[in-house]
Every structure is written in C-alpha cells, then in structure tokens.
Regions:
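Helix-terminus/linker motif at the lipid-water interface of multi-pass membrane proteins
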Residues: 1-19, 88-95, 151-158, 220-239
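Transmembrane helical elements of multi-pass membrane transporters/channels
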Residues: 1-5, 107, 118, 141, ...
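Transmembrane alpha-helix boundary and packing residues in multipass membrane permease domains
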Residues: 7, 11, 44, 85-86, ...
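Small-residue-rich hydrophobic transmembrane alpha-helices
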Residues: 18-77, 115-134, 227, 239
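Hydrophobic transmembrane alpha-helices of multi-pass small-molecule transporters
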Residues: 30-33, 145-150, 175-179
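Short alpha-helical transmembrane segments in multi-pass integral membrane proteins
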Residues: 46-111, 155-210
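Alpha-helical transmembrane segments of multi-pass membrane transporters/permeases
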Residues: 56, 69, 124-150, 161, ...
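Cytoplasmic helix-loop-helix junction between adjacent transmembrane helices
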Residues: 93-98, 105-108, 112-139
C-alpha cells in the first residue's frame, strides 16, 4: 500500500505528500507488529492443539485470536486518533509536513483494525493449509488500492486524502475476504464458545507471537530514529 501511495501521491501532491506518507508509515508497521503478535501466536496454538488431537482447543485458540485482533484493532484506532498530533511529531513530522501527515494518518488509521484482522487471519488461513487464499486476500486489497489511487487523487482531486481513502477501501476488501474464510476452515470447527474471551488462552497466544512482533517493533523504532535524524540533519544543509 505504501509504495503505491508514494508513487501517486508524489505525482499528485508533491514532495510534502511523500514526506507525509513516510512520517505516517510507522502506524502501519506498529499495526503489523500487533497482527504478528496475535496472528502467529494463534496460528501456532492452533497447530499445537491439532497436533495433540484437540480440535476444540484449536477452535478456542483461533476464536480467541480473532477476538484479540478485533480488540487490539479498536484500541489501536482510538489511541492513534486521540494522540495523533503527538505521535506524528514523535515520528519526525516537521511544520510543513505535519498538515499533510495528519490528514493522511487520520484517514488511514480507520483502516488499521481491518489491517490487523486481515494480516492476523492470514496466518490462521495458512495454518489451515490454504496459503493461496491468504495471498488472494492480500493481493485483492493491493490491486483495489492501485486502481482507486489515481482516481481519487487525480480525477476526484482529493489529494493526499484520496490516497488514504483508497488505502482504507482496499484494506476493507481484504478484510471481507479474510472474514469469509471463517465458514471455510477445514481443520477447525467453530462454536459460539470458541469466541468467548479467555485471558489464559490469550496470554498463551501472545507469548507465542511476541518474538515475531518484537522484530517488527524493532523495525519501527529504527524507522522513527531515521525519520527524526533526517528531520534534524537534513535541516543543516541547503541540499
């Protein structure tokens, strides 16, 4: 999503638009860290339970994982929208870039819960033996974003807001495809009880996904340091 947005926003808005999407990008990488935490954690739990011939426990692990994705997604959206100005400045937004970054991030944050569920579900779908369907979920959203970006940015003349809106719509389509798979699982058979929140199961899920999530968080920290370094040292030269 970010690469496509960079291309079209750069053409339609200019260098400030490109800078804004870069400054807002840590929101996406943090989002992916959350998705990895729950997605890989729940997929690992499902695989272990199925290996022990415990289908109900596997369904419970998957169900709790999906519930956690939704909870974390909503919390992340609320926190991001509430502290957006402070976070953008922490990410390295300058005075010139800030209005563009705020406009773009305000819209793309709406899609973060959908992105968390989609990326988290893709791990469960792969664990169910359907990697192609998982790939389709991701590719469809990217294609829709690529189609809508030039329409919203150039035809509708919505600028950077159009790029953000195209991203969110693409993420919603991916989310719908991922959610449809709930009724297509082959190794897991869900019941209502599968989606009852269980704190112990949730902790087990997070403990198994924390390693991959930590790696993604480290990438995010490096990005933020780089952006702030560019903001500071870039201002010291006329080039």
């Amino acid at each position: 999503y970010n690469i496509v947005d960079q291309i079209f926003i750069g053409q339609g808005v200019g260098y400030l638009g490109n800078a804004a999407t870069n400054v807002a990008y840590p929101f996406s990488t943090i989002c992916l860290a959350i998705a990895l935490l729950v997605g890989i954690g729940s997929a690992s739990r499902v695989s272990l339970c199925l290996g022990r011939k415990e289908p109900k426990a596997a369904a419970k692990a998957a169900g709790n994982g999906i519930v956690l994705m939704g909870i974390f997604g909503i919390i992340y959206l609320l926190v991001g929208e509430t502290f957006l100005p402070l976070l953008l400045k922490a990410f390295g937004a300058t005075t010139d870039v800030f209005p563009y970054a705020k406009q773009y991030a305000r819209i793309t944050l709406i899609g973060m819960p959908f992105l968390i569920v989609t990326n988290g579900m893709s791990n469960l779908i792969r664990a169910d033996g359907k990697p192609k369907y998982s790939m389709v979920c991701m590719v469809v959203g990217a294609i829709i974003n690529t189609i809508l970006d030039p329409i919203f940015i150039f035809v509708c003349d919505w600028g950077i807001a159009g790029g953000g809106l195209a991203t969110v719509i693409g993420q919603i389509f991916s989310f719908i495809l991922a959610l449809r798979y709930l009724w297509r699982f082959q190794t897991i058979h869900f019941e209502k009880e599968s989606f009852l929140f269980d704190i112990k199961e949730s902790l087990k899920i997070c403990s198994m996904g924390i390693s991959s999530s930590s790696n993604q968080i480290a990438v995010t920290v490096i990005q933020i340091i780089q952006y702030n370094s560019l903001t500071y040292y870039g201002a010291l030269t006329k080039y």
